């Protein structure tokens, strides 16, 4: 990571130098945001383009919501695809299929505003700032702006390709500003204090790993928390409580992935988690060959809403706190193994992620999460998903072929029973 940080430092110094030089040497920097766009798009010089882009991105960030919506809609009109040119280029290519004519079709089929965002990416911290811009666009909930939402997502899929990402271990010695981000971004089991965080990072039987992008080195994209265990825990309290007995990692036989948090809403739609879990599991296996199981302890965030619609009698009983464990187990198995979706994917979003990633449903745990959040979303029920590294890719392929959730013998037995 130091190598990437050195490169980043060099790039940022150059950008700031260009910007200082540019303010003196490249003429007027327009306060009118639409004229500022023209300056960025009409400039061919690399340095001047960076200067104008820096100025424009600052103007965009300073717009209030109404002005931002107006600006983006103008951008959509004035820098859209030139359809006449596209039709012309397609006709030329149809009559003579060669490399240059194909390149012309590719160029004319892309909206001009896409190139604008590429140029904005060259600014100081441009990648991060565009991620925040997409996050803001999504919050505006304007249907016409969905074009920019999807357009930025397509760019991010290139810029955040997994081959560019760096896996870093997070521990109690990690720099404080990153630890603060871990507290802020934890999305599954809230971290309420520094003591709480220390209990998850400091003990030798607790691990945390994060993906970083070289251009955003101090802000994780996604992180996973791991517990090394002798036995498979049935409750989240066993894992995250502060006053517990630490075990020697050499005595552990199981790694439990108990929390996976995506850190930026501006990157929604890019799946980092599947690469992260498999990478971490592979690394842990190399580091600690005695680990023979990799499982999750996962929430069921959609269970109660599903039950209200598809198992209303059980829902009413549970609402009155008059629901037997057998009935809860029966409906939970239905929820996790039988799809009510048109696409045939699992009902539960966490199950969709893990099953689609090649894991299998191993166990269902009643009374596993007694936090307010856990009770409100799933009556405290959690699930274990097993990652068998030898067949995880095979499972992935089979699932997307036939949409059948692979389950353990225990789950199969319970399903027959109920």
What are these regions (language model features)?
Residues 1-270, 274-418:
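Extended, composition-driven regions rather than compact fold-specific motifs
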């Amino acid at each position: 990571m130091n190598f990437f940080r050195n490169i980043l430092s060099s790039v940022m110094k150059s950008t700031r130098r260009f910007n200082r030089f540019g303010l003196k040497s490249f003429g007027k920097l327009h306060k009118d945001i639409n004229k500022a766009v023209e300056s960025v798009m009409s400039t061919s010089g690399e340095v001047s383009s960076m200067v104008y882009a820096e100025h424009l991105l600052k103007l965009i960030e300073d717009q209030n919501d109404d002005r931002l919506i107006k600006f983006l809609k103008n951008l959509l009109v004035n820098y859209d695809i030139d359809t006449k040119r596209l039709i012309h280029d397609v006709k030329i290519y149809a009559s003579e299929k060669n490399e240059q004519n194909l390149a012309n079709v590719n160029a004319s089929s892309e909206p001009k505003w896409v190139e604008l965002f590429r140029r904005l990416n060259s600014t100081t911290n441009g990648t991060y700032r565009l991620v925040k811009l997409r996050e803001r666009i999504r919050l505006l909930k304007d249907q016409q702006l969905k074009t920019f939402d999807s357009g930025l997502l397509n760019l991010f899929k290139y810029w955040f390709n997994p081959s560019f990402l760096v896996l870093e271990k997070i521990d109690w010695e990690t720099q404080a500003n990153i630890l603060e981000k871990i507290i802020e971004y934890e999305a599954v089991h809230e971290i309420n204090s520094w003591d709480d965080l220390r209990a998850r990072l400091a003990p030798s039987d607790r691990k945390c790993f994060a993906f970083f992008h070289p251009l955003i080195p101090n802000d994780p994209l996604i992180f996973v928390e791991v517990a090394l265990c002798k036995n498979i825990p049935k409750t989240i309290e066993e894992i995250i409580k502060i006053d517990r007995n630490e075990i020697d990692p050499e005595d552990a036989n199981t790694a439990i992935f108990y929390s996976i948090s995506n850190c930026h809403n501006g990157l929604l739609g890019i799946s980092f988690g599947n690469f992260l879990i498999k990478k971490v599991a592979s690394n842990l296996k190399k580091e600690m060959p005695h680990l023979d199981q990799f499982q999750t302890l996962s929430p069921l965030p959609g269970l109660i809403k599903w039950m209200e619609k598809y198992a209303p009698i059980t829902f009413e009983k549970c609402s009155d706190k008059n629901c037997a464990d057998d009935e809860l187990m029966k409906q939970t198995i239905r929820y996790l193994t039988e799809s009510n979706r048109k696409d045939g994917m699992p009902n539960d979003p966490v199950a969709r992620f893990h099953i689609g990633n090649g894991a299998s449903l191993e166990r269902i745990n009643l009374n596993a999460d007694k936090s307010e959040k856990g009770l409100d979303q799933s009556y405290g029920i959690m699930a274990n998903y097993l990652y068998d590294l030898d067949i995880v890719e095979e499972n992935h392929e089979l699932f997307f072929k036939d949409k059948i959730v692979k389950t353990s013998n225990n789950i199969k037995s319970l399903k027959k029973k109920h």
